[in-house]
Amino acid sequence: MVKEKVILAYSGGLDTSVAITWLDKDYDVIAVCMDVGEGNDLDFIHDKALKVGAIESHVIDVKDEFAEDYVLVALQGHTFYERKYPLVSALSRPLISKKLVEIAHKTGATTIAHGCTGKGNDQVRFEVAIASLDPKLKVIAPVREWKWSREEEINYAKANGVPIPADLDSPYSVDQNLWGRANECGVLENPWNEAPEDAYDLTVAPEAAPDSPVYVNIDFEAGVPVALDGKKMKLADLILELNDLAGQHGVGRIDHVENRLVGIKSREIYECPGAVTLLAAHKEIEDLTLVRELAHFKPIIENELSNLIYNGLWFNPATEALIAYLKSTQQVVNGTAKVKLYKGAATVVARKSDNSLYDESLATYTSADTFDQDAAIGFIKLWGLPSKVHAEVQAHKDK
């Protein structure tokens, strides 16, 4: 009997490795791992999938596409879920889903499988994205279906020849990509526990960071970071370099109790050294170049966009419309931000732009001042007129 094909989003971990053998009863499994900058041993992952029963194994480098089509939206949109989380994992899920659907179409597969549990956000992100791209594809979530304890899963793995990962005893659940690292579980589940140092990997403790700051100049063209200290770089490479540099100075640690889409609160530890640095720099160039009305309105868009992406609605028309609006604001966002990295902080200490709306001759309080202060008298009268009329009417009513 010819089996149907299933495309499995494969990580190389225990859950998705067990999923291959579990799915193999009814499907020919094609394992697919997307490299979004997590830094894993991709050759090992490729070979392991075949070893545990996949008929094909694909490892696809999508770092550049991830950076240019997804991370850049988060950067230009200053996306912080609940004003704190820079959308690390949430950003990669739509791209991974898109690639899974593409491979399903190429191979004739009718089903896609993922390794998410039934209590996380990622199951929603994957399945909503896949349904948005091809509603006819079936989606299977083995971990959600088998409902095993960890011990039962390990016993199944041993019985079916699935290698047990060396780091299985780690109490943490980690997800990582170019934009940062997310960590949960173990001692972190108690929000009263301070996160221990072994929960971090990309950053040193701020108090252990160098006692002297380092400065980095970041160049932007149309809202895109294009160079570090004058060195032109692809966006993915620039982010990775900043992850290393800012991480050495303890930048980008985030401890967040967040409201998950599925209705529970979770405590997460994020490390986003490159993201935090770039977000600070980009915001300062915007402050220099955007007109006041746009600078005041854009954060409203940013907050809504953050929620849409976090909640798995990347391919929703609302998200697409907001991204289009966002892109239209970036043509003037050109310039250089000088960022000071020191003891956990990324602080913009200087900025310049050929599109700068800052006019020193208008802002100065020296004799070079060109601001017409006499014009303020009439402006104040007109600006305050509605308030004055309201006060007069209220005073008349109170008599």
Swiss-Prot record:
Residues at which ATP binds: A9, Y10, S11, G12, G13, L14, D15, T16, S17, G115
One function term, GO molecular function aspect: argininosuccinate synthase activity
Binding site residues for L-citrulline: Y85, N121, R125, S173, E258, Y270
EC number: 6.3.4.5
Catalytic activity field: L-citrulline + L-aspartate + ATP = 2-(N(omega)-L-arginino)succinate + AMP + diphosphate + H(+)
Binding site for L-aspartate: T117, N121, D122
Cellular compartments per GO CC: cytoplasm
GO process terms (BP): argininosuccinate metabolic process; L-arginine biosynthetic process; urea cycle
Assembly and oligomerization: Homotetramer.
Protein name, entry field: Argininosuccinate synthase
Species this protein is from: Streptococcus sanguinis (strain SK36)
Gene of this entry: argG
